[in-house]
């Protein structure tokens, strides 16, 4: 008998704006966070003829709901006002998504991240579901001050984690954190893989002057202030340039600018809204990647650099040590420690490999295998099967 097709509905803030061949009606939308890991997994799952994925997302820049198909995946773009979504604790989302699910009849729902209430919605639908942790807001609250919206999401996260049938998360640290606080959880570790372009980077490191690169959100949590404070101190010691790849955050940069000298500012180049292939291209020349983050579960920027062969100097926090093997493909320092960050940069610059923009070859091969898109797909398929098993129907808390 032919194998039955498994239909999966993703509830996701999917970065549809980044797709290369969008329908005309959607092309003028501004780009959000690229969430490249979702596109990587989707590309892998689209290779499986026994799997059918529907991506359901909500936007407010629409005249009406919109549906289109690409590479066997159907995208359902629904219209909803942001204020109504939050004010209703995502019940507005639930009602809209429930209508779509009644029409497509998914075997399974995949709730991507807590940021827009996806696990709450999935639970309300009454179908088997998987919850994917993209950021651990409870842990963030322990590490850094949270804004009002993130505090709201952190409370919803606690509810969702108490009753999710199957949860996926990335790093060993995240697995340990969740098991310690939610012992009833069924957890499937599934690393989010970088885009294939990062595995194909042809490195030509620039070492005179040293070329630093920083990738990620500009924020206190990501340690942007520590980055500039450290480089201000190093200006008299080292000849360097800094490339910052991020989404624009004019408000944060304006608050940071008075603390940065004009001389250092002239050494910095900002680049925004780059496609994954463009970011991969930018990784050809850096000597070192710098990430002084204060709280990160599994930073995608570190994974991208690790599989590209860029040495990483990063804080030893969350899942970062899963990807940065000290002395082999980078160096670690205590989070929030400016002096430790400075010492790590100085050591890396003098390192026989890192100072030339190189990493240990065996470690590079291991990283590429561990973070491969194919492995990611296998792990998520295992999570789907776990959610469809009879044991998953016995939800830990209703």
Predicted regions and their residues:
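Membrane-proximal helix-turn-helix segments that form the acceptor-binding/catalytic region
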Residues: 148-167
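Short hydrophobic beta-strand element within catalytic cores of glycosyltransferases
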Residues: 288, 311-314
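Aromatic "clamp/platform" in nucleotide-sugar-dependent glycosyltransferases that forms part
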Residues: 294
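Glycosyltransferase donor-sugar binding loop
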Residues: 215, 241-255, 272-273
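Conserved donor-binding/catalytic core segment of Leloir-type glycosyltransferases
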Residues: 9-11, 168, 204-222, 228-231, ...
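Nucleotide-activated donor-binding/catalytic signature segment of Leloir-type glycosyltransferases, i.e.
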Residues: 254-274
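Conserved acidic donor-binding segment of nucleotide-sugar-dependent glycosyltransferases
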Residues: 326-327, 331-338, 348-353
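Carbohydrate-associated surface elements
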Residues: 173, 193
